[in-house]
C-alpha cells in the first residue's frame, strides 16, 4: 500500500489536511490513544493522549472544505473503483467501504474475491459491441476493430449469426508494462474484459465463461 500511494502518511494526509475544513486523527500506538484535530490545515491543539489501548492503527476523519471544492458530496462509485484497484494490489488486505447515507457496504478481499458485488459491476455488455446471434462460444467470433468508423464498416459486412464487432480506440493501454490498477481503470481495457466475459484477476478469471473462442 505504501508503494502504491507513494507514502500516504507523508504526502496523502498533509494534502487532505490542507484541503479540509476539519481533520481529526486518532492514533492507537504503544498502549496509548493519541488524538489531534486540524481546521483548514492548522492544528487546534497539540497531539495529546486521551486513553489506553491494546491495539494499533490510525483513524483519519476529514470534512472537505467548501472554500476549495464546489462539490463536497462523496461519490461512492469513484471510491469503490479505487478501493477495488487497491484490493488487487494488496493481497490479504481486507478493505471495507461503508456508505452510511444509504446503509450500503462493499467488502474487497483479493485472496477470496469480492465478498459483495459493487456498483462497478457491469450488468450488461458494452454499448459499442455489436454482438452475434450465436450463443455457443465455440461457434462465435469477436472482431476487434480500430475506431468507430471502421466499426461501422465491419458491422455492415459481418455475418451477424456468428461474428461480433467491438470498436476500440486506435492505441489502447500497453497492459504488459502498465500497473495493474492503471490497467483495470482503463476504459478500453475494461470494455474488452466485459465483452470477453471471463473476468480478470487470480480469483475472478474463469476461462469457461469466455464468450468467444475466436478473437481477431
UniProtKB/Swiss-Prot annotation:
UniProt-annotated location(s): Cytoplasm
Molecular-function GO term, any one: DNA binding
Top-level taxon of origin: Bacteria
GO-annotated cellular components: cytoplasm
EC number annotated for this UniProt entry: 5.6.2.2
InterPro entries reported in the protein's UniProt record: HATPase_C_sf, Topo_IIA, Topo_IIA-like_dom_sf, Topo_IIA_B, Topo_IIA_B_C, TopoIIA_CS, TOPRIM_dom
Span of domain Toprim: 140-216
PROSITE patterns the UniProt entry points to: TOPOISOMERASE_II (PS00177), TOPRIM (PS50880)
Enzyme class, first EC level, given as a word: isomerase
Catalysed reactions, as listed in the record: ATP-dependent breakage, passage and rejoining of double-stranded DNA
GO biological process, one term: DNA topological change
Pfam families: Toprim
UniProt family annotation: Belongs to the type II topoisomerase GyrB family.
Further facts: Few gyrases are as efficient as E.coli at forming negative supercoils. Not all organisms have 2 type II topoisomerases; in organisms with a single type II topoisomerase this enzyme also has to decatenate newly replicated chromosomes.
Subunit structure comment from the entry: Heterotetramer, composed of two GyrA and two GyrB chains. In the heterotetramer, GyrA contains the active site tyrosine that forms a transient covalent intermediate with DNA, while GyrB binds cofactors and catalyzes ATP hydrolysis.
Function: A type II topoisomerase that negatively supercoils closed circular double-stranded (ds) DNA in an ATP-dependent manner to modulate DNA topology and maintain chromosomes in an underwound state. Negative supercoiling favors strand separation, and DNA replication, transcription, recombination and repair, all of which involve strand separation. Also able to catalyze the interconversion of other topological isomers of dsDNA rings, including catenanes and knotted rings. Type II topoisomerases break and join 2 DNA strands simultaneously in an ATP-dependent manner.
Official protein name in the record: DNA gyrase subunit B
Protein source organism: Acinetobacter sp. (strain T4)
Lineage: Bacteria, Pseudomonadati, Pseudomonadota, Gammaproteobacteria, Moraxellales
Amino acid at each position: 500500500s505504501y508503494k502504491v500511494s507513494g507514502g500516504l502518511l507523508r504526502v496523502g494526509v498533509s494534502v487532505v489536511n490542507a484541503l479540509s475544513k476539519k481533520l481529526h486523527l486518532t492514533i492507537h500506538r504503544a498502549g496509548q490513544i493519541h488524538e489531534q484535530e486540524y481546521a483548514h490545515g492548522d492544528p487546534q491543539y497539540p497531539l495529546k493522549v486521551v486513553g489506553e489501548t491494546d491495539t494499533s492503527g490510525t483513524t483519519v476523519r476529514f470534512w472537505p472544505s467548501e472554500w476549495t471544492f464546489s462539490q463536497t458530496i462523496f461519490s461512492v462509485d469513484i471510491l469503490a473503483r479505487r478501493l477495488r484497484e487497491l484490493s488487487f494490489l494488496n493481497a490479504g488486505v481486507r478493505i471495507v467501504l461503508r456508505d452510511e447515507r444509504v446503509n450500503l457496504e462493499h467488502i474487497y478481499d483479493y485472496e477470496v474475491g469480492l465478498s459483495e458485488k459493487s456498483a462497478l459491476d457491469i450488468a450488461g455488455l458494452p454499448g459499442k459491441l455489436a454482438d452475434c446471434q450465436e450463443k455457443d462460444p465455440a461457434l462465435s467470433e469477436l472482431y476487434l476493430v480500430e475506431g468507430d468508423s471502421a466499426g461501422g464498416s465491419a458491422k455492415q459486412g459481418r455475418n451477424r449469426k456468428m461474428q461480433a464487432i467491438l470498436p476500440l480506440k486506435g492505441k489502447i493501454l500497453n497492459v504488459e508494462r502498465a500497473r495493474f490498477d492503471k490497467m483495470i481503470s482503463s476504459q478500453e481495457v475494461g470494455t474488452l474484459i466485459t465483452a470477453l466475459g471471463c473476468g480478470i484477476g487470480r480469483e475472478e478469471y474463469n476461462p469457461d465463461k469466455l464468450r468467444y473462442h475466436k478473437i481477431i
